[in-house]
């Protein structure tokens, strides 16, 4: 974690970060918080802590000249470096993996210059990759290549974008697995008393994403108004081969920021959890990890429950107890299927799950909405006068 402090300037808080660059030289970076000094100290301190945790020290720029002789593989690396400061750390980690492990090795081996790159070269690359990965992965490769070449056009290295002329693979239709109400009850029972209890409970009932469950803090729970606010996430990224924990006061999209009702059974369990954490903190004393104070999903000594722990231990929990294998994310699908089965309109499910638009919800869960099809069939029977027939 880099060093940093708050600085007041023109009645606003600024974050000042101090770090050593790739050459070992001490650097200082100022960032505006947009928070006025008056009554915003705690918010500013929280932002400071987040930036200190997530700040990535800029690496030395690659010694690659942007000219007519640049290889396409080298240009992709240069673009990756340029785009690093404009995107979230988790997005950069995803880009880096695709560019450095897949795209660059393929094109470097072929020695194709940027100015000589043709649509057929890209099409050959996609065809080759489809032999080993699914179409959705190739679509992601295409998206990165297209963005990089768009940048090349912008800075006048090439006149047109060859990726515009490529046929993108058709996206795979995905249907998530889901548990029935009985299976959910069985799962919550076997998870009780384990580190997965709270993640399983909240993901099943509220349909929360893994990042949203692990990002829940006590200040997002209002026990008086009985509300639960989804506004913070915890994710993990692999940067330069190292696993980095990312904590951020934001969710996937604006619609992901939502407030949900805190129902009595969940409220009671969270109050119990709060009491347990207070007890553990007193018993452990100085041994308790105070870095993650305020988070719901921590263990007995205060260590945060990491995303990879949930993904690795969840299938083991199912297998150990003889439950049908599903992914942790499928608890979100299970929540949606139960809502649909109980007559909740798709629009309300969209808002409950925090999808950015209605089409996202409809595309994912329309195959589950059989009840509405029966209703439509019945309406047609009655409309066409088929007597007492029923669908």
Predicted regions and their residues:
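N-terminal core-binding DNA-recognition domain of tyrosine site-specific recombinases/integrases
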Residues: 39-40, 80-157, 173, 304-309, ...
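N-terminal DNA-binding module of tyrosine recombinases/phage integrases
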Residues: 9-12, 19-120, 275-292, 391
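Short N-terminal "domain-start" leader segments
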Residues: 1-10
